[in-house]
A protein has these predicted regions:
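Active-site phosphate-binding/coordination module
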Residues: 1-25
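Generic structural signal of hydrophobic/aromatic residues within well-ordered alpha-helices
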Residues: 6, 51, 55, 67, ...
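Short, conserved catalytic or adaptor-binding loops enriched in Gly and charged residues
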Residues: 8, 72-77, 142-144
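Conserved acidic, metal-coordinating active-site core of Asp-based
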Residues: 16-120, 127-131
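Mg2+-dependent phosphoryl-transfer enzymes with acidic/Ser/Thr/Gly-rich catalytic loops
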Residues: 95, 99-182
């Protein structure tokens, strides 16, 4: 499915992409192959606008929502419902998403007496990247997980789901949290 998305974007839109990794149930497609983050793991502040310009140049006028629609329609052609999210540089496509994963973990934790209230959910992709389209980490907020605590280690400006607390500091903030739990 990811290869088909990659080919469709190239042939029909002239948009060069690269599949940066692929797992049995998930892949990540680099939408801005010319844009090197220079070792930065997190979405950079100017990437969303830069991607919007790239998409428009290639005839994807409605932006990221249209791109996600292309991914979902491609999955349907293979008889597979896929979930697609984006952090600007990468289109993430899978047969499940972070919502599914969080809910499965919480079900398993329940047997150990661990509830969502005992959990915290950390990420760097909560920010709204288009109107009412949030980054992939926002999918961790589900009906089952909403009683937990949500933290964003990205310092990028923008709206986030109401439950998310912005801490910034990148990976170091998360590592400090883990060390303090020991």
């Amino acid at each position: 499915i990811c290869y088909a998305i990659h080919v469709k974007l190239l042939w029909e839109y002239g948009l060069k992409t690269d599949i940066v990794f692929s797992r049995p149930n998930y892949c990540k497609i680099d939408l801005m192959v010319e844009n090197d983050r220079g070792g930065q793991l997190f979405m950079q502040g100017d990437e969303v606008e830069h991607l919007r310009q790239i998409l428009k140049q290639h005839g994807i006028e409605s932006g990221l929502k249209e791109l996600i629609g292309i991914a979902e329609q491609t999955g349907e052609k293979f008889g597979q419902r896929v979930s697609a999210t984006c952090d600007a540089k990468y289109l993430e496509v899978g047969i499940s998403c972070k919502s599914d994963n969080v809910d499965v973990f919480l079900e398993r934790f329940k047997a150990e007496g661990i509830t969502a209230e005992d959990c915290s959910f950390w990420g760097d992709e909560f920010v709204e990247i288009e109107h009412e389209l949030y980054g992939s980490d926002s999918f961790m907020y589900t009906e089952k997980s909403k009683a937990g605590d949500f933290f964003d280690v990205s310092a990028i400006e923008g709206n986030r789901p109401e439950a998310v607390k912005v801490l910034g500091g990148g990976v170091e903030t998360f590592l400090t949290f883990l060390k303090e739990q020991a």
